[in-house]
Amino acid sequence: ALTERAFSWGMALCTAFCAVLLRGFAVQVNNDAAVMLKQKTTVVNLANRLCTRLEENADYQNGAEVVILGEPKRGAYPEESPLKPMERAQFGPLSFDPTFNAHGWYVLVWDELGVQLNECADETVRAISNSDAFKAMPNYPADGCIQTIDGVVTLKVADFPF
């Protein structure tokens, strides 16, 4: 009788412990989803403003290649969520690597806004992101954040961390 009673208490404690863990996991997943949705909404709204600025550029209007570089959170849009998301959820939809960052902007602008930018080659993106001209450019929304570098319309959202 004692072992049955101990077993039932053990099962009850185990079940309660698992329920607490499951609830914590569900809360964390919801926090992460809320943070990622807010980040995406912020970036899409920013992308809309960036495209509006690009459309004013004569080289863009003439079909020049375009590259958008930088993470909004490293520029004018730093973000700290009070929801305490997991570390990977805080990365946002854009990479810190210049090539993947540029590709992320191309995909985001096309998927969310229906605007197809004239992409440039990965080697060109790397060359521009490492150039002194790019490093000297101000970040969006300052005047001069859009410049033509080596024939590519370059829009600088933020500096890269390296």
Residue ranges and their predicted role:
Residues 2-28:
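Signature aromatic-anchored transmembrane alpha helix within multi-pass, membrane-resident enzymes
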Residues 22-162:
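Intrinsically disordered, polar/acidic, low-complexity terminal segments
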